[in-house]
Amino acid sequence: MPKPTISYSLNGLPAAAVDSIGSLLEILARIRGIVLTEQSNDETASIIISAPDVHRLVVGSDDSHYDSTTLYIEDFLNRLCEALDAVGKKAEAGAFRHALQLYHTDRELGALKHGESVTNRQLKNDSFEDLEFLVEAWLVALNSEESARKLPAPLPVKSPDTRAMTLAEKILAHHAFSLPSSGGLKSGELGMKHGMVSIGELPSVWRNDRFWLAGDHTVEPRTYDQPRVRELLNGLNDAKQEFKMTENQGSNYTILHTEFVRERAEPGMLALGSDSHTCSAGAVSCLAIGLGAADVMTALATGETWIKVPESIRIDFTGEPAWYIRGKDVILYILKELKRNTFAADRIVEFGGLGARFLSCDARFAITNMCTELGGVTGIFVPDEVTNTFVSGRPQSKYKSNSIYFQPDKDASYAATFQIDLTMVESFIALHPSPDNVVPVSEKLDMSFEGCFIGACTTTEEELVLGALVLEAGLKNGLGLAPGKRMVVPGSIPIVNSLRELGLLEIYAQTGFEQPAVGCSLCLGMGADRAGEGENWISSQNRNFKNRMGKGSTGHICSAATVAASSFSMRLTNPAALLAQVSPDRYKALLESCQSYKNRVRKVKSSKKESVKRSVSVMPSYVEPYLHFRSPLTEKHTQMHAPSGGEGEQCGNLDIIESKIYALGDFVDTDAVSRDLFLHLSDVSGETMTSGVLTMLEIIPAAFILESPTDTLLGSHALEFTNPDFRDKVRQGMRVVVAGKAFGCGSSREEAPRALKGLGVQCVIAKSFSFIYGRNQPSIGLLGINIADDRFYELAKTGAGIKIDVPGRVVRLEGQNFPFVLDDMELSLIKNNGLATAYKKYGKNVFALLCNTKSSLRPSELAELQLKGVSDGMQTSLEW
């Protein structure tokens, strides 16, 4: 049977339409190898796409604002899609339709920076280029998807020999290339995982449609003229063009996490991001983990990473909260009860229970967003009817078609379990300088403020709507505005659009709230917006560390409703009285209007009907993970050696480290941030700031990293404010740092271990490491060891001699031996001077080659490995 062919005719079309259609057909041929021929008089073809009739199009179109060229092109592309469907090229037809839909969607309604105002669009040269880019990017996405490893179909029922697993363990097991046991995963085990990456920078990418990028931290229209900001803006655009990115949000369209969770993340996905608040995507039951830059960039290039499965704790919600209690007050209550870096430290926080059905996905966003403040690796909600309704209500099918609904086994093992009664949640405030220093608002009334801030990623759309209604109630009561600064910064342009359409932005304006561009703003205090020295602020952001909002400032965090109520008098005010005047029905109606605005997209002809209406709330159909098991390798295929030369190379022989100790305490933080410190950081006026005060123990000041310093330069500033003798002591031979609990807690930045390594530190020993910091150490080539024995810390005084036998997995101190666990993957990374160097050496096969070492354990021992477990000093290691 002859192969179906498609020919076309462009007779009578204007030159602009012919040129644009020709360019699109050339892209189709170049990327997908589908060649259409222009029809000749004697040619026969299975399908002929004739030239559109412009008179018919103009008369029959309801798009009177479109010029004829626009209509010619769109009609031709619709016919092309039908022809591609007819010859079995449905994927290509879908790519064209999706590109057209994005192209015709208003940027403020979710076009992800590609669209202009629908009512004003006319196809001009620059917009022709936009359409061509979209088509090319989505056709390239087909190629990258086909070449990437595909996840297997999940199983309908659980195999009888599969061990009980938590939700996180099931997601990791399903994404794993191979497992250390045929029975599934449990805490402490290692596997190689697929990763959907949210940010990074490498000369190639694994999949151009799985790379989410947004400029939010320091880029802002008021700073666009600054050299460093221009460099970042150019980098955003270069990445979009070079990688043909389908998910490049540009600058000031969305905070990184906001639209990613609202429109892209799906249940059962695995997401990696270079920001500690990546955990926000747990709101839609996506396992989202923040990692350091080296980890994320390598995953971006390879689509692979390695993960030691963390333990999980379980939080079950009970009861029904008051209608005005949103996610921010819930997570503050959890922080109040559990405290920071305690039960959740280095663990995944799994949320569920009967009360979870009263928590919207916006509320869940605020809760999972602040799991990093709780000290957790990430947070994730068990998917339910709330999740299913939210995801299935997305207007575009492409962004709801990859969902996999797992649920934890009833007999899964948790490190700890808790119940949170939602009826006990009230309006709370976390007092400076810690997110867990939480008290009821009613206990601290009349605290005075110089500023009020409603914004940051943790402040969701529903919180912004409620804040506006509280302000409206205050205006109706005739409340005056005391002197002070007020600012509102929604998390994305689509949210801004909804608030504007509903008249709520006008309410914020009437009550004195400035409205700068979308971004992190005061939550970070490193861009155009900064709290002044000595100022006291109340904020709906997620962190209230010292100097977080600006040098010398203090901040307290609470819900948007509490900030709004306090903004009239500039004194802490319980919002209850104003909330009592807000109609719950009106609030609900406004949220439904927000959803309808989000779903207001221009329809594109399709071979099948698609609804953009929110579906009826139903429980999802749960499935079980498909498990890949491969027996441990018995032979070495690769012998790896640390590369010679290069900055920050490990000193001496890694097998045996003999040195002296420099002792630190608990909670050494990478992110107790002094934002305006030193070293060539310019403010909005262009002045250079060269001083600052750091009162909490941190490894490296955050603001310093903006200048992309070397490891050695970072090391020259390590702990310089809190421990001024540290650098000299290390240089004099104290090259082993001993610390307590949660060493490296804070952000995902890898500059902290880089600073220690650059100074000459050979090893850090701690009772526990923050998850991200603990990952960053081997990824940059620095040895880190966990020892839980209290006797060790009684002996480990500054200046004491210490010997570390890495092959023997034992530390010798004051005549006593202390065994430790070090996985082969971690050791391989360290011996190769870190992940970046290993990637340069091995390329996209880096993980396969790093894993090709002989296991020191039998399969039965592999299956029994526990997180950070030590048994009689036995070396424990895993392979895939």
From Swiss-Prot:
In which pathway does this enzyme or protein participate?
Answer: Mycotoxin biosynthesis
* Residues reported in the UniProt entry to bind [4Fe-4S] cluster: 457, 520, 523
- SUPFAM superfamilies under this entry? Aconitase iron-sulfur domain (SSF53732), LeuD/IlvD-like (SSF52016)
Which EC number(s) does the record attach to this protein? 4.2.1.33
- Keyword annotations of the record: 4Fe-4S, Amino-acid biosynthesis, Branched-chain amino acid biosynthesis, Iron, Iron-sulfur, Leucine biosynthesis, Lyase, Metal-binding
- Write out the GO biological process terms: L-leucine biosynthetic process
Q: Which cofactor does it need?
A: [4Fe-4S] cluster
User: In this record, what's one Pfam family?
Assistant: Aconitase_C
- How is the cofactor bound, as the UniProt entry phrases it? Binds 1 [4Fe-4S] cluster per subunit.
Biological function: 3-isopropylmalate dehydratase large subunit; part of the gene cluster that mediates the biosynthesis of pneumocandins, lipohexapeptides of the echinocandin family that prevent fungal cell wall formation by non-competitive inhibition of beta-1,3-glucan synthase. The 10,12-dimethylmyristoyl side chain is synthesized by the reducing polyketide synthase gloL/GLPKS4. The thioesterase gloN/GLHYD exclusively interacts with gloL/GLPKS4 to maintain turnover of the polyketide side chain.
**Name of the protein in question:** 3-isopropylmalate dehydratase large subunit gloJ
**Which organism is this entry from?**
Glarea lozoyensis (strain ATCC 20868 / MF5171)
Q: Which gene encodes it?
A: gloJ
